[in-house]
Protein backbone atom coordinates (compact mmCIF):
# COMPACT_ATOMS: atom_id res chain seq x y z
CA UNK A 1 0.00 0.00 0.00
CA UNK A 2 2.83 2.40 0.83
CA UNK A 3 4.39 1.81 -2.59
CA UNK A 4 1.09 2.66 -4.28
CA UNK A 5 0.82 5.94 -2.35
CA UNK A 6 4.40 6.88 -3.23
CA UNK A 7 3.83 6.00 -6.90
CA UNK A 8 0.60 8.02 -6.98
CA UNK A 9 2.38 11.03 -5.45
CA UNK A 10 5.17 10.79 -8.01
CA UNK A 11 2.63 10.71 -10.86
CA UNK A 12 0.80 13.75 -9.47
CA UNK A 13 4.06 15.65 -9.02
CA UNK A 14 5.15 14.87 -12.57
CA UNK A 15 1.79 16.04 -13.96
CA UNK A 16 1.95 19.33 -12.09
CA UNK A 17 5.51 19.74 -13.37
CA UNK A 18 4.22 19.63 -16.97
CA UNK A 19 2.17 22.75 -16.34
CA UNK A 20 5.22 24.58 -15.00
CA UNK A 21 7.24 24.13 -18.21
CA UNK A 22 7.32 27.33 -20.23
CA UNK A 23 8.39 27.67 -23.85
CA UNK A 24 8.52 30.95 -25.73
CA UNK A 25 6.66 31.06 -29.04
CA UNK A 26 8.45 31.11 -32.37
CA UNK A 27 6.85 33.75 -34.61
CA UNK A 28 6.89 33.57 -38.42
CA UNK A 29 5.24 36.26 -40.58
CA UNK A 30 4.85 35.59 -44.29
CA UNK A 31 2.47 36.00 -47.23
CA UNK A 32 0.72 33.08 -48.87
CA UNK A 33 2.01 34.05 -52.32
CA UNK A 34 5.04 36.12 -53.38
CA UNK A 35 4.21 39.79 -52.78
CA UNK A 36 3.12 41.88 -55.76
CA UNK A 37 1.98 45.48 -55.24
CA UNK A 38 -1.75 45.88 -55.83
CA UNK A 39 -2.42 42.13 -55.99
CA UNK A 40 -4.59 40.63 -53.17
CA UNK A 41 -2.78 38.13 -50.96
CA UNK A 42 -2.98 36.65 -47.46
CA UNK A 43 -0.82 37.72 -44.52
CA UNK A 44 0.02 34.82 -42.18
CA UNK A 45 1.39 34.78 -38.65
CA UNK A 46 2.37 31.27 -37.56
CA UNK A 47 3.08 31.02 -33.84
CA UNK A 48 4.52 27.70 -32.66
CA UNK A 49 6.37 25.85 -29.94
CA UNK A 50 4.80 27.71 -27.00
CA UNK A 51 3.63 26.54 -23.59
CA UNK A 52 1.38 27.26 -21.74
CA UNK A 53 -1.43 27.81 -24.22
CA UNK A 54 -2.53 31.30 -23.10
CA UNK A 55 -1.45 33.65 -25.89
CA UNK A 56 -2.61 36.82 -27.62
CA UNK A 57 -1.85 37.37 -31.32
CA UNK A 58 -2.63 40.50 -33.35
CA UNK A 59 -1.92 41.31 -36.98
CA UNK A 60 -0.95 44.95 -37.48
CA UNK A 61 -1.11 47.42 -40.36
CA UNK A 62 1.06 50.48 -39.76
CA UNK A 63 1.11 49.67 -36.04
CA UNK A 64 -2.68 49.43 -35.69
CA UNK A 65 -4.58 46.20 -35.02
CA UNK A 66 -6.33 44.68 -38.04
CA UNK A 67 -9.87 43.77 -36.98
CA UNK A 68 -10.87 41.28 -39.69
CA UNK A 69 -8.52 38.42 -38.80
CA UNK A 70 -9.17 34.69 -38.75
CA UNK A 71 -7.23 31.93 -36.99
CA UNK A 72 -6.89 28.18 -36.77
CA UNK A 73 -7.91 26.19 -33.74
CA UNK A 74 -5.30 25.89 -31.01
CA UNK A 75 -3.36 22.67 -31.68
CA UNK A 76 -0.46 20.89 -30.05
CA UNK A 77 2.62 19.06 -31.31
CA UNK A 78 4.12 15.74 -30.24
CA UNK A 79 6.16 17.57 -27.58
CA UNK A 80 2.92 19.08 -26.13
CA UNK A 81 3.82 22.60 -27.25
CA UNK A 82 1.08 24.59 -28.98
CA UNK A 83 0.74 26.27 -32.37
CA UNK A 84 -1.68 28.63 -34.13
CA UNK A 85 -2.05 30.35 -37.48
CA UNK A 86 -3.54 33.86 -37.73
CA UNK A 87 -4.28 35.22 -41.19
CA UNK A 88 -6.04 37.99 -43.08
CA UNK A 89 -6.49 39.11 -46.65
CA UNK A 90 -4.38 42.13 -47.61
CA UNK A 91 -3.07 43.93 -50.67
CA UNK A 92 0.65 44.74 -50.48
CA UNK A 93 2.02 48.12 -51.51
CA UNK A 94 5.16 50.18 -50.91
CA UNK A 95 3.74 52.45 -48.19
CA UNK A 96 2.06 50.12 -45.65
CA UNK A 97 3.94 48.11 -43.03
CA UNK A 98 2.55 44.82 -41.72
CA UNK A 99 3.51 42.91 -38.59
CA UNK A 100 2.43 40.33 -36.03
CA UNK A 101 2.37 41.16 -32.31
CA UNK A 102 2.41 38.32 -29.77
CA UNK A 103 1.86 38.49 -26.01
CA UNK A 104 2.86 35.41 -24.00
CA UNK A 105 3.93 34.90 -20.39
CA UNK A 106 7.46 34.02 -21.55
CA UNK A 107 7.90 37.54 -22.99
CA UNK A 108 8.47 40.49 -20.62
CA UNK A 109 6.57 42.65 -23.15
CA UNK A 110 4.65 41.92 -26.37
CA UNK A 111 6.94 40.93 -29.24
CA UNK A 112 6.37 42.35 -32.72
CA UNK A 113 7.75 40.71 -35.87
CA UNK A 114 7.53 42.66 -39.14
CA UNK A 115 6.54 41.11 -42.44
CA UNK A 116 9.44 41.05 -44.89
CA UNK A 117 8.05 40.99 -48.41
CA UNK A 118 11.27 39.36 -49.67
CA UNK A 119 10.96 36.29 -47.47
From Swiss-Prot:
Record GO biological process: antigen processing and presentation of peptide antigen via MHC class I; immune response
Function: Component of the class I major histocompatibility complex (MHC). Involved in the presentation of peptide antigens to the immune system.
Organism: Pithecia irrorata (Gray monk saki)
GO cellular component labels: extracellular region; MHC class I protein complex
CDD domains: IgC1_beta2m
Domain Ig-like C1-type: 25-114
S-S pairs: 45-100
Subcellular location: Secreted
InterPro entries per UniProt: B2Microglobulin (IPR015707), Ig-like_dom (IPR007110), Ig-like_dom_sf (IPR036179), Ig-like_fold (IPR013783), Ig/MHC_CS (IPR003006), Ig_C1-set (IPR003597), MHC/Immunoglobulin (IPR050160)
Protein name (database record): Beta-2-microglobulin
Keyword entries, A-Z: Disulfide bond, Immunity, Immunoglobulin domain, MHC I, Secreted, Signal
Family: Belongs to the beta-2-microglobulin family.
Residues spanning the signal sequence: 1-20
Assembly, per entry: Heterodimer of an alpha chain and a beta chain. Beta-2-microglobulin is the beta-chain of major histocompatibility complex class I molecules.
Organism ancestry: Eukaryota, Metazoa, Chordata, Craniata, Vertebrata
Highest taxon above the source species: Eukaryota
Amino acid sequence: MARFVVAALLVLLSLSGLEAIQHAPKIQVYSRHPAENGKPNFLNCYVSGFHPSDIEVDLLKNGKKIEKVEHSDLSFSKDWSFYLLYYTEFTPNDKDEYACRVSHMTFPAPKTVKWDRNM
